[in-house]
From Swiss-Prot:
Capsid protein (CA) is the structural component of the virus-like particle (VLP), forming the shell that encapsulates the retrotransposons dimeric RNA genome. The particles are assembled from trimer-clustered units and there are holes in the capsid shells that allow for the diffusion of macromolecules. CA also has nucleocapsid-like chaperone activity, promoting primer tRNA(i)-Met annealing to the multipartite primer-binding site (PBS), dimerization of Ty1 RNA and initiation of reverse transcription. Pfam families: rve, RVT_2, TYA. It comes from Saccharomyces cerevisiae (strain ATCC 204508 / S288c) (Baker's yeast). Residues 660-835 form the Integrase catalytic domain. It catalyses: DNA(n) + a 2'-deoxyribonucleoside 5'-triphosphate = DNA(n+1) + diphosphate; Endonucleolytic cleavage to 5'-phosphomonoester. It is found in: Cytoplasm; Nucleus. This is Transposon Ty1-DR6 Gag-Pol polyprotein. Residues 1338-1476 form the Reverse transcriptase Ty1/copia-type domain. The keyword Iron-sulfur does not apply.
């Protein structure tokens, strides 16, 4: 079937093709910036033309249904009474309707409207009727009378009937929304114009052409009521009607005024972008039009420079003027005036050529006798033209008809005519003939011409592939062809009557013919340029002639209207009439045999065979020409399809579209192989394979059966693996139709995960070739590996897995890469690979006896999937193990075959070979194992020696006691320790590396006790006997040295008949004093759990006075006391009430260590004295700890320890790491896209404000010369990676202003287009707070500035292109960026370098080293945050001088000058600041929180009471596995991100008291359980209840001219998951809190002291940096102090002992602290825990304590 698209005149709608395709309506949601008045006017004209030519029956004239239309009432129903004139408001056909008028074509009365039922409605008087209009022009809403019959008249009498039939006027649509009113008014005005009321419509100046009559006013008023219901009118319309309900004219006038004002600027831009000029109008008029548009745009602030204006003008040039686009496009300095000089020159040359040309012959006979060639006389050219110009055969005709071509012929260069040319013919109307031509037309009757048709001519159509004609007068050799299918541009079929030849006789006496189709159902006679090109005839629209390729002119082309025509006088007429054509197929003499008949006759042979046979006369009686072959190609014989059905051929390369359409790991192939028979039950019988379509990466999984749950487990595993390892989501899985894939369980699983199953079709195994070929390859490899190695067949899957590993690493000959490389993985390290079946010897780490062989033979299979080891088969056990403890046997001829496998016995649980074990043995005492996957079975205590020179069998010499130690005591205690089993933790944090937990060289295996005095003097103590260590925080200090113990493997508990301990003196190696340990009874000992010594000593007793300070420096006592008092004097510490002295508890009656739920995060925390790490033996069962558990539970119950729970087994849940600044939280989107702000915005007022902001942003972009406006680039010519997507974002600021910003999509910017090393710096929050604090203390003026469009001041170095803004209408073009557009990766860094250079070079500032965006000179300090500046100075004039210099270069706005002496309010970077110089400063966010928190959809004040604290002590976050579907999980995670994001923003700004809760909850963003959400809601509720709280600063009144910078540190030991500790620091400048930090320790601490050292080590670097900043900004002397409530930390820092620490990580931290403290003049003092305000950063506190610690600095 031949498909053809042509513009046609539908039998239903007899309008022109142009009208039918250009009539359109502006939709409600259309972008107002893209609507121009000119386009609307054109559309309305076209629509009017189409409507004027339509006729319809009464049944078809109904308006489309509208739910707001009231149904017409029957005439018998009495109308309602309303108003003083009964029944007059209901205008029936006999009363108020004009003749022939009825509502919607029905002869009934008009329905009433809500206006008529309202008290406002007053109907017109009884004499008021609708106007009567002459019948010749039609009446409003008129329909033909029933007597007129069918309105589709014969084409020959259409014109005559047009005057006798009343014109149907389509009513306007019903108004359904106030936002649709502007568009509805356009249709209503059009309705009035069609109703002959155009004269009463107000013009632009608001006055109508003529005065409106009473009848017309009644008609206007009632129709407005009907189609514009009151509930849908805009407010301004209702306001007009409330004053005068009949003033419809005022509404129309104001609407027209609004339309004019809204679209004038957009119209000018659209008109300028769509200029067209071909010389048809005077050049002066064209120049005036263009210059007026440019002047108007310039006056409105849209500056069009010469280069852009010239490009827009040249783009619209055509015809003779087109060559200017090629001669001028590189002229950089061309002006509009120069371009118009060239246009004027060509226009004058054209006019001169036309005046000097001889006229054409008027009739065809004269032309035949004239043999001249119409050569053009040569005239001097003003401008040299390029003779090689490209012809665009798709002229305006194609655009006018909106025809999409189905056959495109190659374009030919026909613009220049060598030696002969014909001037174009321009007709202003059908009666105006240039050059004296006479247009003749045949007298054959056919369809009437359209109004824009040139009679007697053929329309040249470049979009049509076939020629169509309405008259049969010129068709030669006509024949019927019903199988031809032709469609127009609207995809409507055009019936074809006949096909024939169209013969031409051109002016050079040449004849030619083309095929033509006959149909009366078109608006024009169309001549296809494609068919002319097929006979070597082309159309040259530059010279307006038809010519041959050699330049011979055949016929002139006439331009009439927007189209081009060729006269029909060149057609040769035929003698065939219309009836002959319609019946030509009935002639028996010309009838051919149909191909389907011949096909059946000749046994359903194919057409090629039949034609070949007829051509060679193998079949007689008829010839090849006797068969109609037109349908042979497309004919489908149903019987052949059934009888000859075959499988489709596999198309080579058919999967390329999937490779191009999907990203890696989105399209998988899978298949199952098996079963393999005669295997043991432990060996898999099947395997399932997966192959990625893009990377060809392969996976194999073993299966023991093909059950649904087994397959589902594999699918779950691989989907999770791909998601986590490759950050990809599988979209499609292709598989066969086996029951294991088509079952309902798997189908629901795939559907739930959004995966599309792609099944193979029936009997189409080749479509599943990827998976099938992989299985075949793996099985070939498997058989080969088993044959080569000689291993048993039940190891077949190991061979499959080995082959998969290798195949993923081999390069493909086609892609030149391996699957691993495609997947982004490193290549296979062949040094880690062994040949399959390689003989090895595996180390037996746990033999049954010490004399048993330590090696066992085995065979290497493949690298382990779960470790760095190797899977090795052990024949003696018929098992496989995962280990790295093996030795390779180089040849098979070895002792491997001589081993007696039966003589070897091993532990049954060989899975222990895969357990991870970290040795506790020091590197200098036992050689460490290199195998991280095999657990060592050595008792780590058996080989530890404190002094290697002492013999192991002398127990009394295990330690070296002092002389004062009784021998008996030493011996007894040594024996007692020999039976002690020190137990390791049940679980070890998987994140801890081996180096983190390995001991130092002389690590003790027994608890230690240290002396307070000796520790304070730097001494380290050794315990005489291995004694049980007391656990009290206040009375215990553990030592780092201990005695050696004997083998304790065979003793799990203490003996009941052991003697009691006596007081044991302690020998001090660093001090002189000895202390004794109190006695411990057996009963007490039995209740104890041996606690392993921490690597750094625990806290010493804290029973001294709170003023007992330990300064680091050693000045005199008086100076120490003065320094301490000076540092602590102004700090906002709580005032504690006096307390009565209390007795300290017996250290041996303290709480026993309890296995706390270390896998849980606690908002209640774990106290320093009740959290211990219990080291248990891995061999010890749970039943062995009955006493321990019993005591723990009893203690837990009696002490009511809410923050702890008894030990119990619990599955660990890995959470995300704690975030220190919560930078990964997604912010709440407050901006709008272009479509949200303008296109689909139903708020008219807000929409207008956003449009205004849009134009303001565009003007600013043009003003800043953001892009190169001199040249536009084609998208195809630019490297795609240098093209940056752009978009407009809109936002309503807090001050109520609407802002638009044109930004680049930097999130998808290619890495090659920016320098990743450049950084966009902004002022650090600590720097801003420091500057504000110093400003308060020094009475500084604070000035706030803003630089408009700051980024646009920075040039861009890279070559980047963006798409133009949408209002320019150039979607296919690109513009080159010149400035750093917002959103680009490099924009921030470019702006920073630009403003930094200006401030330094022009303003005399210098940047503070180490603090980016902080600039200073001798008088002014500047803090820069992107485009916001905050200036601080003692003298306001200094700030003003900086402002003047900034204004010389940048558009600088003064937000707040800060000159008042009263309280001044600022909004600086989100902080709401109240500042009164010399008195106070208050920092808060009340207004911002009041606006933002309600938008979070959090239930506020559910119980109607305010919270007093953000959390409660003792509450744990339960981390049981969540049972939640995917959608709900994502929704809750998104909610957590919003809540924690806002809380983090507020907390790090000024609410430092909330940082602990924020940090803890941030760790559970990906674990949104109900409990976590409730705690988060509680935190948000507390923020809401305390939103009015402020950080209060008062001016410092120092006794000394010094600046005091203090850091207060604290830590909570082991209260976070995996035994991690929470640390916190608060920083104060001159007694004012300027910052805080709460985070989880990065290392696992084993004691409170280690946690405190970690906290101090985090505080000191920032303290030193702040000290440098303060000294740079203020030249006063500075005193630095560090306060901590850990005396042991202070003791370690001040100690000069150089002995190594047992834990090298914290030892390194401690040594570094010593250096920093001693080298930076830092004072370290003790602060009482009850006064430590940093306690709020590390744990939740009771309400009373929380208020006590915070009420002095935030309230």
């Amino acid at each position: 079937m031949e498909s053809q698209q042509l513009s046609q005149h539908s039998p239903i709608s007899h309008g022109s093709a142009c009208a039918s395709v250009t009539s359109k309506e502006v939709h409600t949601n259309q972008d107002p910036l893209d609507v121009s008045a000119s386009k609307t006017e054109e559309c309305e004209k076209a629509s009017t033309k189409a409507n004027s030519q339509q006729t319809t029956t009464p049944a078809s004239s109904a308006v489309p249904e509208n739910p707001h239309h009231a149904s017409p009432q029957p005439a018998s129903v009495p109308p309602p009474q309303n108003g003083p004139y009964p029944q007059q408001c209901m205008m029936t056909q006999n009363q108020a309707n004009p003749s022939g008028w009825s509502f919607y074509g029905h002869p009934s009365m008009i329905p009433y409207t809500p206006y008529q039922m309202s008290p406002m409605y007053f109907p017109p008087g009884p004499q008021s009727q609708f106007p009567q209009y002459p019948s010749s022009v039609g009446t409003p809403l008129s329909t033909p009378s029933p007597e007129s019959g069918n309105t589709f008249t014969d084409s020959s009498s259409a014109d005559s009937d047009m005057t006798s039939t009343k014109k149907y006027v389509r009513p306007p649509p019903m108004l359904t929304s106030p936002n649709d009113f502007p568009n509805w008014v356009k249709t209503y005005i059009k309705f009035l114009q069609n109703s002959n009321l155009g004269g009463i419509i107000p013009t632009v100046n608001g006055k109508p052409v003529r005065q409106i009559t009473d009848d017309e006013l009644t008609f206007l008023y009632n129709t407005f009521q009907i189609f514009a219901p009151s509930q849908f009118l805009p407010t301004w319309v209702k306001d007009i009607l409330s004053v005068d309900y009949t003033d419809i004219m005022k509404i129309l006038s104001k609407s027209i005024e609004k339309m004019q004002s809204d679209t004038q600027e957009a119209n000018d831009i659209v008109t300028l972008a769509n200029l067209q000029y071909n010389g048809s109008t005077p050049a002066d008029a064209f120049e005036t039009k263009v210059t007026n548009i440019i002047d108007r745009l310039n006056n409105n602030g849209i500056h069009i420079n010469n280069k852009v204006a010239c490009q827009l003008i040249m783009r619209g040039l055509s015809g003779e003027y087109k060559f200017l686009r090629y001669t001028r496009h590189r002229h950089l300095n061309m002006t509009v005036a120069e371009l118009f000089l060239d246009i004027h020159a060509i226009y004058e040359e054209q006019q001169g050529s036309r005046n000097s040309k001889p006229n054409y012959r008027r009739n065809l006979s004269d032309e035949k006798n004239d043999s001249r060639s119409y050569t053009n006389t040569t005239k001097p050219k003003v401008i040299a033209r390029n003779p090689q110009k490209t012809n665009n055969s798709k002229s305006k005709t194609a655009r006018a008809h909106n025809v999409s071509t189905s056959n495109n012929s190659p374009s030919t260069d026909n613009d220049s005519i060598s030696k002969s040319t014909t001037e174009p013919i321009q007709l202003n109307n059908k009666h105006d003939l240039h050059l004296g031509q006479e247009l003749t037309e045949s007298t054959v009757n056919h369809t009437n011409h359209s109004d824009d048709e040139l009679p007697g001519h053929l329309l040249l159509d470049s979009g049509a592939s076939r020629t169509l004609i309405r008259s049969a007068h010129h068709i030669h050799s006509a024949s019927s062809n019903p199988d031809i299918n032709v469609v127009d541009a609207q995809k409507r079929n055009i019936p074809i009557n006949a096909i024939g030849d169209l013969q031409f006789h051109f002016q050079d006496n040449t004849k030619t013919s083309i095929k033509v189709l006959h149909t009366p159902n078109i608006a024009y006679d169309l001549l296809s340029l494609n068919e002319l090109a097929a006979v070597d005839i082309t159309a040259c629209f530059t010279k307006n002639v038809l010519e041959r390729s050699d330049g011979t002119v055949l016929a002139p082309i006439v331009q009439y209207g927007d189209f081009y025509w060729v006269s029909k006088r060149y057609l040769l007429p035929s003698n065939i009439s219309v009836p002959t054509i319609n019946n030509v197929h009935t002639s028996e003499s010309t009838r051919k045999y149909p191909y389907p008949f011949i096909h059946r006759m000749l046994a359903h042979a194919n057409a090629q065979t039949i034609r070949y046979s007829l051509k060679n006369n193998t079949i007689t009686y008829f010839n090849e020409s006797d068969v109609d072959w037109s349908s042979a190609i497309d004919y489908q014989c149903p019987d052949c399809l059934i009888g000859k059905s075959t499988k489709h051929r596999h198309i080579k390369g058919s999967r390329l579209k999937y490779q191009n359409s999907y990203e890696p790991f989105q399209y998988l192939h899978t298949d199952i192989f098996g079963p393999v028979h005669n295997l043991p039950n432990s060996a898999p019988s099947y395997f399932i394979s997966f192959t990625d379509e893009t990377t060809k990466f392969r996976w194999v999984y073993p299966l023991h059966d093909r059950r649904e749950d087994s397959i589902l487990d594999v699918f779950t595993t691989i989907l999770a693996f791909i998601k986590n390892q490759f950050q990809a989501s599988v979209l499609v899985i292709q598989m066969d139709r086996g029951s294991e894939y088509t079952n309902r369980t798997l189908h629901k699983f795939l559907e739930k995960n959004g995966i599309t199953p792609c099944y193979t079709t029936t009997a189409d195994s080749r479509a599943h070739g990827v998976a099938e070929r992989l299985n075949r390859t793996l099985l070939d490899d498997c058989r080969t590996q088993l044959q080569c190695s000689g291993l048993p067949n039940y190891l077949w899957f190991s061979a499959i897995e080995f082959s998969t590993i290798v195949r993923n690493s081999l390069a493909s000959p086609k892609s030149k890469k391996s699957a691993r490389q495609h997947a982004g993985l490193a290549g296979l390290d062949i040094s880690t690979l062994l040949p399959f079946g390689q003989p090895v010897i595996v180390n037996d780490h746990n033999p049954n006896s010490k004399i048993h062989p330590r090696g066992i033979p085995g065979y290497a299979l493949h690298p382990s999937r779960n470790s760095y080891g190797y899977i090795i088969y052990l024949p003696s056990l018929k098992k496989t193990v995962d280990t790295t403890n093996y030795v390779i046997l180089q040849g098979k001829e070895s002792r491997l075959d001589q081993f007696n496998y039966d003589a070897l016995t091993f532990d049954e649980d060989l899975n222990r070979l895969t357990a991870s074990y970290h040795s506790f043995i020091a590197s200098n005492e036992i050689q460490e194992s290199n195998d991280l996957n095999i657990e060592s079975d050595h008792d780590f205590q058996s080989d530890i020696e404190l002094h290697p020179e002492q013999p192991r069998n002398v127990l009394s010499k295990a330690v070296s006691p002092t002389d004062s130690t009784p021998p008996s005591t030493h011996t007894e205690d040594s024996k007692r320790v020999s039976k002690t089993n020190i137990r390791a933790p049940r679980e070890v944090d998987p994140n801890i590396s081996e180096s983190n937990i390995l001991p130092s060289k002389k690590r003790s295996s027994t608890p230690q006790i240290s002396n307070i005095e000796s520790t304070g003097s730097g001494g380290m103590h050794k315990l005489n006997v291995p004694l049980l260590a007391p656990m009290s925080q206040s009375n215990t200090h553990e030592s780092s040295h201990a005695s050696k113990s004997k083998d304790f493997r065979h003793s799990d508990s203490y003996s009941e008949n052991e003697t009691n301990h006596t007081n044991v003196p302690i020998s001090s190696t660093g001090g002189t004093n000895n202390k004794t340990v109190p006695q411990i009874s057996d009963q007490e000992t039995e209740k104890r759990i041996i606690h392993r010594s921490p690597s750094i000593d625990a806290s010493p007793p804290e029973n001294n006075s709170s003023h007992n300070i330990v300064p680091i420096k050693t000045p005199t006592t008086v100076s120490e006391q003065n320094t301490e008092e000076s540092i602590i004097a102004d700090l906002p510490l709580p005032d504690l009430p006096p307390e009565s002295p209390t007795e300290f508890p017996d250290p041996f009656k303290e709480l026993p260590p309890i296995n706390s739920r270390q896998t849980n995060s606690s908002l209640g925390g774990i106290g320093d004295s009740n959290a211990y790490t219990t080291i248990n033996s891995k061999k010890r069962s749970l039943e062995d700890n009955e006493t321990e558990i019993k005591v723990s539970r009893d203690t837990w119950n009696t002490k009511n320890m809410r923050s702890l729970e008894p030990p119990r087994s619990k599955k660990r849940i890995h959470l995300i790491a704690a975030v220190k600044a919560v930078k990964s939280i997604k912010p709440i989107r407050t901006t709008l896209r272009y479509d949200e702000a303008i296109t689909y915005n139903k708020d008219i007022k807000e929409k207008e404000k956003y449009i205004e902001a849009y134009h303001k942003e565009v003007n600013q972009l043009l003003k800043m010369k953001t892009w190169d406006t001199d040249e536009y680039y084609d998208r195809k010519e630019i490297d795609p990676k240098r093209v940056i997507n752009s978009m407009f974002i809109f936002n309503k600021k807090r001050d109520g202003t609407h802002k638009a910003r044109f930004v680049a999509r930097g999130d998808i910017q290619h890495p090659d287009t920016y320098d990743s090393g450049m950084q966009s710096n902004t002022v650090h929050h600590y720097a801003l707070m420091t500057s504000l604090s110093l400003a308060l203390d020094n009475n500084y003026y604070i000035t706030q500035l803003d630089i408009s469009s700051a980024y646009l001041y920075a040039d861009i170095k890279e070559e980047l292109y963006i798409r133009p803004p949408p209002h320019l209408g150039m979607n296919d073009k690109l513009i080159r960026l010149k400035k750093s557009l917002y959103g680009l990766k490099q924009s921030g860094a470019n702006w920073y370098e630009t403003i930094k250079s200006y401030l330094i070079q022009q303003c005399g500032m210098e940047e503070v080293r180490g603090w980016s965006c902080v600039f200073k000179n001798s008088q002014v300090t500047i803090c820069l945050f992107v485009d916001d500046m905050v200036l601080f100075s003692k003298n306001l004039n200094s700030n003003k001088r900086i402002i003047e210099k900034l204004k010389m270069q940048y558009d600088t706005k003064i937000i707040n000058l800060g000159e008042s002496d009263e309280e001044i309010q600022y909004d600086i970077l989100g902080l709401e600041i109240k500042y009164q110089r010399g008195k106070y400063m208050k920092l808060g966010m009340e207004n911002s929180l009041t606006e933002k928190i309600p938008k979070l959809n959090v239930p506020l004040n559910p119980k109607g009471r305010k919270l007093s604290a953000p959390g409660q002590p003792g509450l744990y976050i339960d981390q049981d596995e969540l049972e939640i579907d995917e959608d709900e999980y994502k929704e809750k995670v998104h909610e957590m991100q919003k809540l924690i994001g806002l809380a983090s923003y507020v907390g790090y700004k000024f609410r430092f008291d909330l940082l602990y809760y924020i940090n803890t909850l941030a760790q559970h963003i990906l674990f949104p359980s109900r409990q976590v959400l409730d705690m988060t809601y509680e935190l948000i509720q507390f923020m809401w209840d305390t939103r009015d709280k402020q950080l209060i600063w008062h001016k410092n009144k120092p006794t000394k001219p010094d600046n005091k910078l203090v850091a207060i540190s604290d830590a909570s030991y082991g209260n976070q998951p995996y035994y991690k500790s929470q640390i916190g620091n608060i920083f104060l400048l001159n007694g004012k809190v300027i910052g805080g930090k709460s985070t989880k320790a990065s290392l696992t601490c084993t004691s409170t002291t280690e946690a405190e050292i970690h906290a101090v080590s985090e505080a000191i670097p920032l303290l030193n940096n702040l000290s440098h900043l303060v000294q740079e900004l203020n030249k006063k002397p500075i005193i630095k102090g560090l306060l901590t409530d850990s005396r042991s930390t202070i003791s370690i820092i001040k100690s000069t002992n150089e002995e190594k620490f047992r834990n090298r990580f914290f030892g390194t931290k401690a040594m570094r602290l010593r250096d920093e403290v001693s080298g930076n003049n830092l004072y370290v003092y003790y602060i009482e825990t009850k006064k430590n305000i940093a306690d709020v950063m590390t744990k939740p506190l009771p309400i009373k304590t929380f208020k006590l610690l915070t009420n002095k600095w935030i309230h």
